[in-house]
């Protein structure tokens, strides 16, 4: 049986933190492939300005091209309407594939507010990594609660903390600050060519 990881996000823009998480997940969980899933129209981003999906797709594709075992899917950006995680998992789930959905600890804290959370937890192994602002105590407490309620096993991915965020990168670009220690040079080139993250 193939072991596929799915890492979703707006990737606006993709940065070294995303690549590090995917690399460590692939290595630690012995995954055959990690699929990057740029979000099309995510419900939790409604009302927020998000870069055109095709440009975000292009940035992700460029960023992962030299990594073996990384791939990209346009499933969510091609979808009409909102992109729900349970639909994405249903699309990729089959008898020959075991799915690992990789997400931040913040998502575990509010997983029950997600559309059809029970379906999500039944379709995949939920893999969470700690991000800034979440104590291990709170994470463990929520992990135990979800595991008991839904009879699932949640995997906590031990990672070195990288304080990189797409929001901070966008602000730095708008302020004409350097971001080449956060973002691959090839992605900076695409950002510059398309004049992204500069306020009108």
Curated annotation (Swiss-Prot):
Catalytic activity: nicotinate beta-D-ribonucleotide + ATP + H(+) = deamido-NAD(+) + diphosphate
Homology family: Belongs to the NadD family.
EC number: 2.7.7.18
Coiled-coil region: none
Any GO molecular function: nicotinate-nucleotide adenylyltransferase activity
Listed pathway(s): Cofactor biosynthesis; NAD(+) biosynthesis; deamido-NAD(+) from nicotinate D-ribonucleotide: step 1/1
HAMAP family hit by this protein: NaMN_adenylyltr
The name this protein goes by in its record: Probable nicotinate-nucleotide adenylyltransferase
Keyword hit for NAD: yes
């Amino acid at each position: 049986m193939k072991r596929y990881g799915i890492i979703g996000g707006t990737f606006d823009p993709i940065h070294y933190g995303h690549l590090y998480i995917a690399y460590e997940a692939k290595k630690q969980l012995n995954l055959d492939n990690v699929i990057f899933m740029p979000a099309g129209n995510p419900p939790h981003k409604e009302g927020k300005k998000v870069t055109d999906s095709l440009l975000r797709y292009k940035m992700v594709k460029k960023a992962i091209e030299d990594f073996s075992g990384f791939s990209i899917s346009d499933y969510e950006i091609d979808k009409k309407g909102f992109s729900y995680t349970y639909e994405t998992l249903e699309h990729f789930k089959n008898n020959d594939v075991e799915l690992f959905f990789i997400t931040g600890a913040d998502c575990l804290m509010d997983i029950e507010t997600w559309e059809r959370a029970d379906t999500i937890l039944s379709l995949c192994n939920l893999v969470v990594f700690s991000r800034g602002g979440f104590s291990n105590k709170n994470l463990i407490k929520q992990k135990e609660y979800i595991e008991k309620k839904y009879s699932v096993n949640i995997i906590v991915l031990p990672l070195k903390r990288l304080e990189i965020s797409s929001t901070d990168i966008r602000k730095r670009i708008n302020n004409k600050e350097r971001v080449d220690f956060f973002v691959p040079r090839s992605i900076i080139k695409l950002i510059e060519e398309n004049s992204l993250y500069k306020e009108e």
